[in-house]
Amino acid sequence: MSLKRTRARERALQALYQIDVAAEGIDDALSRFWKSFEPVEREVMEDAEGFVRGVAAHRRTIDDTIEGVSTNWRLDRMAKVDRNVLRLAVYELLRTDVPVKVAINEAIELGKKYGSESSGAFVNGVLDKVAAGLPPERRRTDR
């Protein structure tokens, strides 16, 4: 796990949360978001923006995937932090360049850090179900 990628995920989650709360466009939200931070490493900022734009571009598929495995939980009823941790993680799970275990573990840590006491377990449960639906070659632990 790269520390820069971890920081990028953290910034992406914060930006996704802000976008969710403010219900505004990505460009305006990202511009305002970055102004609220001390200078951020270029690579971290680029990766974070890539995550945010990727989630936005695939949001319908991501949300459908989450709702498909979230028994008795609609997205609009989930805590905003949990919802956005899941969106970020599912985006990574649907890509092929991020190991499944890394995406899940990073999401669990984000849930624990920014969510409620039960967020880590909730995120883990949902993402385990999403991962179970991935093609077998994608689920391999050596990826």
Swiss-Prot record:
Spans through the membrane: none
A Gene Ontology cellular-component term: cytosol
A Pfam family that the UniProt record links to this protein: NusB
Entry's family note: Belongs to the NusB family.
Keywords: RNA-binding, Transcription, Transcription antitermination, Transcription regulation
GO molecular function: RNA binding
Record keyword NAD present: no
Name of the protein in question: Transcription antitermination protein NusB
Function, in words: Involved in transcription antitermination. Required for transcription of ribosomal RNA (rRNA) genes. Binds specifically to the boxA antiterminator sequence of the ribosomal RNA (rrn) operons.
GO BP of this protein: DNA-templated transcription termination; transcription antitermination
Keyword RNA-binding: yes
